[in-house]
Amino acid sequence: LLIICLVGCHFKEKRAKQYRDTILQSVQVVIDSSLDYGDALQSYERARALQSHQKYSALVNSTLTKIEGMKDFEGDTTLQVFSKELLVFYKNTLDNEINPFLQSVKGEAFSPEETLVADSLMIKLTMSENQYWERFNWAEKKFYKEEKIATVEK
């Protein structure tokens, strides 16, 4: 009976690791891609910024759909909730702030005023995303510790 319990616990930890890794890897791609997105926006070239915006927005939306489609882990929703919070922040910023700005750019190259707006939007995005990153990192560490994932990592 003790052996069955130990095997069952070890199996739960392996499933927890797989669940965590799936969320972590999905969200990490979005986080890492934000740097390329920022570079494209701050190239001050309309076509490059729009192309990057469409690609990044699609990535955020598909990742959000993937996370929303996942079930909780045995009643624990912490990691899922905070990953969705981060992704919704990106989605709302892209849809409600950056996209309207990009649609308003008239020329191929940003005007001096548009350059200032682009810089301001990126500063705001960067400053705001830190709080969401911190909350997501907290949730990931909490899940890692509570589910004893270290016991199945090598």
Q: How would you describe each model-predicted region?
A:
Residues 63-85, 99-105, 140:
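Short, solvent-exposed, charged loop/turn and helix-capping segments
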Residues 9-54, 146-154:
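Immediate post-signal-peptide N-terminus of mature secreted/exported proteins
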Residues 50-57, 80-85, 112-124:
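Short, charged, amphipathic alpha-helical segments
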